[in-house]
Design a protein with these regions (language model features):
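Asp-based phosphoryl-transfer active-site loop
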Residues: 3-18, 221
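Hydrophobic packing residues within well-ordered alpha-helices of enzyme cores
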Residues: 50-54, 163, 237, 253
Length: 263
């Protein structure tokens, strides 16, 4: 029986080291479509930003869970969007500026960051091939700029605890490179995005299968009927999964879909 298949991007569909989505993964996506599955991208990125749109055009998802559930779209339709409170945002940015941390967000074709050189270093550590368009971070406080989530770059072990202690309403999901983290308000997750899409599609009774590799995927893998961890996933993600497949360079997506009888 077909249903909804949820895929993380970085480290799951996208091989960041080579900046490609493996042919076997694209083949699996096409076979899933033919079999009636709805394809959902579920990522910490905003897939509408200048450096992510090209991946969306390659995957051709039916729907996207952006920024860890902060925004949900179906095709060109905006289904849900949470906008951060400007007062909270101002407090976060002031704190990080005083501490010398790198914090910010990408909105559209612009990258608003404190200490942007640290963001560039984090991109390199994560092997992200991104051409950044940095502008002053204060632009995030413009009433016309809607900020859904933030991105942190820096020392996870030392700086992440300081941010979460000062702002208990925030949760930082570390990248697999440990060079940065997605920053979200507690209560938002990819799993919540899944619930919104299942409601939209009236998908009660349909199977949900989720694929991921990083800590921000754990809630999604647990919420799905079947959670699949990539072979290259963090150990905590593997423990949370129902099935662990091969890594991204050894046809992990295709092999899992075949093993589960999805294709």
């Amino acid at each position: 029986m077909a249903g909804l298949a949820f895929f993380d991007l970085d480290g799951t569909l996208l091989d960041n080291d080579r900046d490609i989505i493996p042919e076997s993964s694209l083949k699996a996506l096409e076979l899933l479509r033919r079999g009636g599955w709805r394809i959902v991208l579920s990522t910490g990125r905003d897939m509408d930003t200048h450096y992510s749109i090209r991946y969306r055009s390659i995957v051709r998802p039916d729907a996207v869970i952006h920024q860890n559930g902060g925004k949900v779209t179906v095709g060109d339709k905006l289904l849900y969007k949470h906008v951060m409170d400007k007062k909270l945002l101002s407090e976060i940015l002031s704190f990080c500026r005083e501490k010398g941390f790198c914090m910010g967000s990408s909105v559209g074709d612009k990258d608003y960051f404190i200490n942007p050189e640290k963001k560039t270093a984090a991109d390199r550590a994560y092997n992200r091939f991104i051409e950044r368009h940095f502008v002053p971070f204060e632009g995030l406080l413009d009433p016309d700029i809607e900020v859904v989530g933030l991105s942190f770059a820096g020392n996870i072990q030392e700086e992440k605890p300081q941010i979460e202690k000062h702002f208990p309403q925030l949760e930082l999901f570390a990248f697999s490179s440990n060079a940065g983290a997605d920053v979200v308000e507690r209560g938002f997750s990819k799993a919540e995005g899944m619930k919104r899409l299942c409601s939209y599609y009236d998908a009660e009774g349909e199977q949900t299968v989720a694929f991921g590799d990083s800590p921000n995927d754990i809630a999604l893998l647990k919420a799905a009927d079947i959670g699949v961890a990539m072979g290259n996933a963090d150990e905590a993600v593997k423990r949370a999964a129902d099935h662990v497949t091969d890594d991204i360079r050894h046809d992990g997506i295709f092999n899992a879909c075949r093993y589960l009888g999805m294709i």
